[in-house]
Amino acid sequence: MVRKKILNPDRVRRIKGGFSFIPHRFVTDGFMSSLNGSELLLYLFLVAVSDRYGLSFYSSTTICKLLEMTSGHYQKARQGLIEKDLIDFNGTVFQVLDLPASLGVHPAVGNLFEEV
């Protein structure tokens, strides 16, 4: 068993105010590797800004500005996350969803559509 030692005890993360998390399954079950760069950036942003129910209200204009993403890349990324069952969107509000039981798209397939 690996013994863990805190590298910098003065800078240990603590939960203060808002807090978000990404389940370990996001990495180990291949969800992360199924996303292209824009999808991953948008997903991480939505996780970081969402409330405890996974809801966020950022407009597409604000998201594109903050992520330095074109409207086209944003729309493709949003649609990709919806198709992979990671988020829901009603035109105004985003919801980051609990991870599905399995990937809807094989990890290698997601990377085929990455922007140039």
What would you call each of these model-derived segments?
Residues V49-S102:
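Winged helix-turn-helix DNA-binding recognition segment
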Residues H24, S33, K65, K76, ...:
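Charged/polar, solvent-exposed surface patches and flexible loops
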Residues K5-I6, R11, D98, A108-N111:
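Acidic/proline-rich low-complexity IDRs
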Residues F19-S20, T28, R78, V93-V96, ...:
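Short, structured secondary-structure boundary patches
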Residues M1-G54:
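Short recognition helix of helix-turn-helix/winged-helix DNA-binding domains
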Residues S102-V116:
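Short, amphipathic alpha-helical interaction segments positioned at domain boundaries
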